[in-house]
Amino acid sequence: MEASPASGPRHLMDPHIFTSNFNNGIGRHKTYLCYEVERLDNGTSVKMDQHRGFLHNQAKNLLCGFYGRHAELRFLDLVPSLQLDPAQIYRVTWFISWSPCFSWGCAGEVRAFLQENTHVRLRIFAARIYDYDPLYKEALQMLRDAGAQVSIMTYDEFKHCWDTFVDHQGCPFQPWDGLDEHSQALSGRLRAILQNQGN
C-alpha cells in the first residue's frame, strides 16, 4: 500500500518488497520511490512527517489505453497536494530503487519542476543506475545541471529507509551480501558520469 499525502496513518512498505526492490539484484521491473520533505529555516531543517511516504511506478495497460507512469512523475503529480509555500525553502529527498530515466521523460520533467519551483531543493539517493536506458548518462547529467544532488545509496540510506518507510515489526535492518561493495562501485560510476561535462 502507498502513503497518502493527506494527514492520517502512514502506510509502510512490506519488508520483502523493500529488500527485493532495493537490493543489488537485477531484473527488477518496478521503481520504488520513498520520499520525505523538510522545510529549511536559517540553516536548520524541520522534518515534515506528514509529507513522507512511498510510491512506485504504475505499469502500462495498453488494453485500457494507459501507458504507465514512472514513480518520479507520480511524485510530481502529488506535489500540489503538499501545498509547499513558495515563500519557504524546502528540501525533498528521494530514495529510489532506480535512477531517473531520460528516454521516457523523467529527467526532463524533474528538471522542469526544479526550474519552475526554485523554492525546492532535490536530493536523490538511487540504489541502482538505470543503465537499461541508452541515455542514462544524459539523464543523470541533466539532473545535476538542474541543481539536483544525485548520489548512490549506501548502508546509511538503506538503513534510514528501513527504519522510516518499512513495516519491519521491530526487526533491525540486515544488509545483504555485497551491499557496501556494490554501493562503492556504483558511486564511482556515478562520479565519473557527473564529472564528465561533455557526455
Swiss-Prot record:
Q: What class of enzyme is it?
A: hydrolase
List ligand-binding residues for Zn(2+). H70, C101, C106
> What cellular component terms from Gene Ontology apply here?
cytoplasm; nucleoplasm; nucleus; P-body
Q: Which residues form the active site?
A: E72
Q: Which CDD domains match?
A: cytidine_deaminase
**According to the UniProt record, what happens if one changes E72Q?**
Altered deaminase activity and restriction activity towards genetic invaders
User: Which cofactors?
Assistant: Zn(2+)
Where does this protein reside within or beyond the cell?
A: Nucleus; Cytoplasm
Q: Which UniProt keywords apply?
A: Antiviral defense, Cytoplasm, Hydrolase, Immunity, Innate immunity, Metal-binding, Nucleus, Zinc
Keyword Mitochondrion appears in the UniProt entry: no
The induction field says:
Up-regulated by interferon and CpG single-stranded DNA (at protein level).
Leftover remarks: It is one of seven related genes or pseudogenes found in a cluster, thought to result from gene duplication, on chromosome 22.
Q: What does this protein do?
A: DNA deaminase (cytidine deaminase) with restriction activity against viruses, foreign DNA and mobility of retrotransposons. Exhibits antiviral activity against adeno-associated virus (AAV) and human T-cell leukemia virus type 1 (HTLV-1) and may inhibit the mobility of LTR and non-LTR retrotransposons. Selectively targets single-stranded DNA and can deaminate both methylcytosine and cytosine in foreign DNA. Can induce somatic hypermutation in the nuclear and mitochondrial DNA. May also play a role in the epigenetic regulation of gene expression through the process of active DNA demethylation.
The name of this protein is DNA dC->dU-editing enzyme APOBEC-3A
